[in-house]
Regions:
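A short Gly-Trp-Pro
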Residues: 1-5, 10-117
Length: 117
């Protein structure tokens, strides 16, 4: 089990295993958020909320981006469609030693027309 949290600790994330790779996307929203995404099936992720997350949608509105209402850290994204078997956690919330072992995949989301705003 690997655990991470937002800055204030009121949103905690537990995943079954450390990510082997993370995605650094440069689309308009990921670039602004400064996230590294690690992807998991939702059943392998546990989100513990001491305060509710705030959500944001844009573009095709297929994802909810979650952030801590207290400290503002982007914590994860979840699909609008519950049948979609993938979600992303902000790997920057994991311990640095866990993140250091992950391979970084650079995704040119800025060149994909669906990710611009």
């Amino acid at each position: 089990m690997v655990e991470g949290s937002c800055h204030c600790g009121k949103i905690r994330i537990e995943v079954e295993a450390a990510p082997e790779k993370v995605t650094d996307c440069n689309c308009s929203i990921c670039r602004r958020y400064g996230t590294l995404w690690a992807y998991y099936p939702p059943r392998q992720v546990r989100i513990i909320e001491d305060v509710p997350t705030q959500t944001y949608q844009w573009g095709d509105r297929s994802l909810y981006f979650h952030r801590c209402a207290e400290c503002g850290c982007v914590t994860h994204w979840s699909p609008v469609d519950p049948a979609r078997d993938r979600m992303g956690i902000n790997a920057n919330l994991l311990p640095p030693d866990v993140l250091a072992a992950a391979q970084v995949h650079h995704l040119d989301g800025a060149s994909y027309g669906g990710f611009t705003r």
